[in-house]
């Protein structure tokens, strides 16, 4: 479809935005996200025969690339041939994706399982003969977004994904959506080792690699190579943002780590869902952006809980290895070096780091597993405009799985929007908080205090993996916050 044809469709698309949000046509016509979602989508992107015993699997040479650049897909299958289809994930009228390439025919090759490093437990693949994929076609470079390459073994029909992000390093989109790939990798137990004991064979690893396929997410749900993107929170938020016509560009937290100039190119930064693992550089860059007036929206919980370091892989490729000693931080090589002890891979709020995440976010992690309701506290706040909610009103089922609360390190002037009680199976109980504050720069910082908030935005995965929890009120609140950020009205 030509750009002219797409522009002709815009009035209908604008009128059909699901949350009642109006986009000025003169603005919409230059909104690449809206134009992209006017293109024909497909529902053929989902797996019809997911791999069950590693019949086919793969990983990408980078977590993200700039649009038009190349990326290598490393694939292992014992079958003689496989195909690759590539999809950009979005709304597309509810179809959920657009096919941008494929099917591409490839010869199969069984790749070796690496041995774990005897000291750190690192599992790093060094596979051969990748498929080189250029993120461009006859229409030009692909638009920024989250992409899934679907691998299909020809003989058996077994399938798996490889996930990667396409950036747009030249465009100043209103919103920057960060995919939290370091958290995907921390929980990934492919080969038998993750940063966690619960899904590791023996002790948890002290280092994990992006140079391997994704095996499972934190909750044991098979992800078929897509990391934590599809089955938990990020895809729900992405679908809603693109459905509602927001101007969005995409990056990963590795990009946030690398580039101090990334966030200031955008009006607001979105941390979505489960964003648990942060480097010192990530924290510096996000706080510096806030202090320059970039708004922050934390649509999740448990963000910036553990500090990690990024190191090269065995080939020298930068930022492919995540170091995280966590509860074993005393064994971290930096622990004995006073000059570098602040970078020890432990909790941000404790020890030599002593940089509580609540000072940035407004709240910080307090409990899991939680499955409860969000309870309104200050219903007079502008964030609740148009919701019809009063104090004590509830947003059913949107509090969980991990939740955050106000802490002593929270900034002064913090507005408590919701104060939600919860009870754990252990008998413990407490409260989680939704908050908003305004930094001295004028930047607004919003935190939902709940991972489940994204299920209020979009019902993908319901009822297959969870109950339906889409909430008109949650969508209106999110609109109110994002629109206030983008309009520059300010005021917490």
Tell what function each PLM region has.
Residues 25-55:
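N-terminal pre-domain segments of enzymes
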Residues 5-22:
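N-terminal export signals
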Residues 82, 123-171:
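Extended acidic/polar, glycine-enriched regions
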Residues 112-143, 226-312, 472, 491:
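Helical hinge/lid and interdomain linker segments adjacent to catalytic or ligand-binding clefts
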